[in-house]
Amino acid sequence: MEYTTPPCDLNAVRMYRLNRVRAELEKRDLSGIILYDQLNTRYACDATNMQIWCSHNEARYLYVPTEGPVVLFDFGGKDILCEGLPTVDEIRPPINFFYMVAGVEYANRAHEWAADIDGIMGTHNRWNKRIAIDRMSPLGVQELERLGYQILDGFEVMESAREIKSDGEIQLMKKSVEVCEQAIGMMREALVPGITENALWAELHRGNIAGGGEWIETRLLASGPRTNPWFRESSMRPIEKGDMVSFDTDLVGPYGYCCDMSRSWICDAEPNDEQKRLYAEAYHQIQDNKVLLKPGITFREVTDSLRPMADEFVPGRYGVAMHGVGLCDEFPAVYYPQDWDKHGNDGVMKEGMVMCVEALIGSQGGREAVKLEEQVLITADGIEQLTSYPLETEWL
């Protein structure tokens, strides 16, 4: 981010991340990886260019070889957005074959694209025609396979690389948390009867952008009866006195790191007994579950040790009990016992992983729900909590 003083050595973070990617490629005996996903591209080289637009238009891509020069095929074909980056060795104009720009020539453009990739890979000593791709049009995959390439899942590579954060990454994440919590403070000040959900949600956006942040992934703010069931998006509903207001930030802040925390408040009133009851259970879910995290514990062991949830709250439980986070929500996802057989996948918690611990508490058919979430770093001794915006402990 230009015109800022970073809290750490950005080039050290950049090289750490690139080396993590290359280590995962090495483990899988891959020649390299082609990245179209904008957050994977950000992780591997830290070059940004219209990230949201390029997330739904395959207009820029990155080739990271296991050995050899990293090539960024950037929209516009210029280097103004990656000057001085130690992670990018060459800039080229992209060969785009998405329909908006290629029209009826998309098949021919895909053929040209594959020939170009083949030419680049053919210059590398490690050329074995095993390559990973994170996301792209099936036509591009077909063209590479026609040239004899074996295509592997790029998300396995990238999620594995992104799993362990460096000290520098944690410093950048703490900056994102700082900006997010300042913006939450702006929301709290703006919360008065009559303000719409959207106007309140806009305060989070305003604080994030003004503080150097980038975007917000979702629209998860709801009030009163719109909180239960969860996942209704922010609306033009005026918030009323005494309403529960619940929100989930999903905020991509400064330097591209995510602050994913949730809070629930009452608008201009003291909570009633039912609101206190819901809040207390959500609070204890967070407190009891976050301390389970430590290096070496398996995902299944975490699932089996989660705080039991009363039957009335089970139907409205959140989709996961906790999940990883970095530039966005990341691997792993840890599920509730009720969901393990269908969705569970095992693994091991490691030092350096950052996890978000979730709680969503609302009775089936009840008026409101409480959403709480904290972001924590797994350390050698347990956890360091990264989020610190106060909870409503006086309601307990």
Outline where the language-model segments fall.
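Active-site neighborhoods and metal-handling regions in enzymes and metal-associated proteins
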Residues: M1-L396
